[in-house]
Amino acid sequence: MPDLLLELFSEEIPARMQRRAAEDLRKLVTDALVERGFLYEGAKAFSTPRRLALHVAGLPVRGQDVREERKGPRVGAPEAAVQGFLKSAGLASLDQARVVADPKKGEFYVAVIERPGRETLDVLAEILPAIIRAFPWPKSMRWGAASAEPGALRWVRPLHAIVATFGPETETPERVPFRVDGIEAGFTTYGHRFLSPGPIEVRRFADYLPALERAKVVLDADRRKDIILHDARDLAFARGLDLVEDEGLLEEVAGLVEWPVTLMGAFDASFLDIPPEVIRATIRANQKCFVLRAPAADPAAKGRERLANAFILVSNLAASDGGAAIVAGNERVVRARLSDAKFFWETDRKIPLAERLPKLDDIVFHEKLGTQAARVGRIAALARAFAPVVGADPAEAERAARLAKADLVTEMVGEFPELQGLMGRYYAELQGEPEAVAAAIEEHYKPLGPGDRVPTGPVSVAVALADKLDTLVGFWSVDEKPTGSKDPYALRRAALGVIRLVLGAGARLPLLPALAAAAGGHGAAPGGFAADLLGFFADRLKVHLRDQGARHDLIDAVFALPGQDDLLLVVRRVEALGRLLDTEDGTNLLAGYRRAANILRIEEKKDGRAHDGAPDPARFALPEETALAEALAAARGAAERAVAAEDFEGAMRALAGLRAPVDAFFDKVTVNAEDPAMRENRLALLGALRTATLAVADFSRIEG
């Protein structure tokens, strides 16, 4: 079957946009084809710095013929209805329609509309230019003399050529006939800008790939990544070094080159006195190069990696001198950048962190929430308050919190913001701060995401909790909350961080008092937003536990009870409830609860009031009523005592004992008895069952 080959050749596309653009191209073209009834066998998109390409395999030569019967008005209908039917069906008169009789509706007109399938080539010529003109680049530009004209093409960088061919592999494909802003789709593309800049004639995808390879272009981004990674590892191995792999950098570099050539450079060993993270950030950010690791650990490095004074660079050029000039040029730039970093390192060390704190008055955290200096004061107070909860020394927690943001005004963090916290730890260690304080300065930002490590040091946990709760309460107090997919201040991440910190430390930190303490630092009353923020935590806890296999409805069932703000106890209760419902007794108890709840809902609606009074034992007529009442009293008391003792497994066992008397009650007892007093008493007994389950969870929230 015929294939489509499409290539859009332009100036350099930013690396960060290439993957998304290739996927957008694939989806836009294939969706447009499917909408028009053209199915295909497979589609794959490609990207390089200078081109987007798409191969769609297994398309039909033409679309299928369509036969449609369109029902019209009744025979004898008003003229306006008849004329509207004729116009919509494309008929000249009613003579072209059929009359169909319906036993119930009488006779009515039916138009038979037959549309022959369109040639695929014609459809492609229609949809491709429209897709190119409306392509969803995050940023785009106009260029050339035509740029001032209305409706001028916008592209990420100037578009120079379009290849668009369609046809079977066994025949010569045809050109898809269309033009976009003077660019005629054809068979001509171009190779590597320097190594093979001449035109290349391509007709089909099977010829396209090898033609580009001969022209020094590797079309597939994943293959370019594999080449870079393989060659970089080989170069490092040959020198007895290890490559420090970096997936983000690898993805970016693969988007900067069409013909990757991997080379090795070096820098003066004296620069290794700089922290390895600084060397890595310098070489990565400025030169897009990979650093190398020395094979043996340095005892003085305190567990941190020891880098080698060498780096891997990736060129887009196979130079005649073997890359010597390219390496020398990169080494000059790396030397200059590392010299700057060394200057920052030596300058920053001269000023203790505590002496930098006044400068935080000049940094605005948020226009509604004040400066970083004010924030540091709030975090320090919270960290001291939280310290006993997590087993930290209050003085160390407060000290760490006061120094936690001091590195924001250092030269190094000013140049490399991603090193905040880490540089604070280095400077704190050098000025003799306790290890727990230094570690907390680095770790208080953690966890930065679902996969990030959670701090375990008590001081680190105290400061991290204080930092995140201050952020959450602050933004809630000024009504700057996440909405939909928008979360500019990463508040969802902060809430998830609090949850993971609390659970990881096994900390008993009731949220409502903690939120009140944080609100006090902002001069705000938490009453206006505490419930909403607690609900936000519940939603984040659902996400966290669901990722671990827990049921979201069980979390709802526990949070529906009043006063559930102790995250550790909520999780323990959810886990115990899940284990109960995994048993036969639990499943049957839930079924009995639902039966009782359904009866109560119907009867309470009918009666206009709740049946939540205590049942009268004197009105029990059957032994099953007495047995259930006694079981409910015993189970409720046992469950409440177990919950008070935080023995949630015991509470669930107490409820599980209700299964047999509940089953027997529904087997033998008619709730809606003819005697009104007996009916009332039996409904009260069901109300007691509903109340008893509330000792552990709101069973009405449980699904399934």
Swiss-Prot record:
The keyword Nuclease does not apply. GO terms for biological process: arginyl-tRNA aminoacylation; glycyl-tRNA aminoacylation. It catalyses: tRNA(Gly) + glycine + ATP = glycyl-tRNA(Gly) + AMP + diphosphate. It is found in: Cytoplasm. Keywords: Aminoacyl-tRNA synthetase, ATP-binding, Cytoplasm, Ligase, Nucleotide-binding, Protein biosynthesis. One of its GO terms (molecular function) is arginine-tRNA ligase activity. Its main location: cytoplasm. Belongs to the class-II aminoacyl-tRNA synthetase family. This is Glycine--tRNA ligase beta subunit. It comes from Methylobacterium sp. (strain 4-46).
